[in-house]
A protein has these predicted regions:
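N-terminal/domain-start alpha-helical segments
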Residues: 1-121
Length: 122
């Protein structure tokens, strides 16, 4: 089973996204910030990280930089900010995809599958 780490501080998004991803056959663990994400990744292997750009604890760009420096795991940004600067910054930091909110659930699943396929995990 594919394990996804969801790094998101909005509890409503965590609940709805976790439920949807679980129904699609993914095992989801969630944390609300960079420190917790780094700790969980060190303790448990994740196959993919879904990462919000705006976190109450730090920011997603710094989290992506830290995750990519220490772990070999694909990262998909989820963000309400779909501006060009944010998108380019995300990709420059090593993000594998960038999905603006609100997103369509089926598109999210397609993008997850695509990233997993490109990294050899599906």
């Amino acid at each position: 089973m594919i394990k996804i780490l969801l790094v998101e501080d909005d509890k409503i998004i965590v609940a709805s996204l976790s439920e949807y991803l679980n129904s699609e056959g993914y095992l989801v663990r969630s944390v609300s910030g960079q420190a917790a994400a780094m700790k969980l990744l060190a303790e448990e292997k994740a196959d993919l990280v879904l990462l919000d750009v705006s976190l109450a604890e730090g920011n997603g760009f710094a989290a992506c930089r830290a995750i990519k420096a220490e772990f070999d795991v694909p990262v998909i940004f989820l963000t309400a900010s779909g501006d060009e600067f944010s998108t380019v910054t995300g990709f420059d930091l090593g993000a594998d995809d960038y999905i603006p909110k609100p997103f369509r659930p089926r598109e999210l699943i397609s993008r997850i599958r695509n990233v997993l396929r490109l990294t050899g995990l599906s």
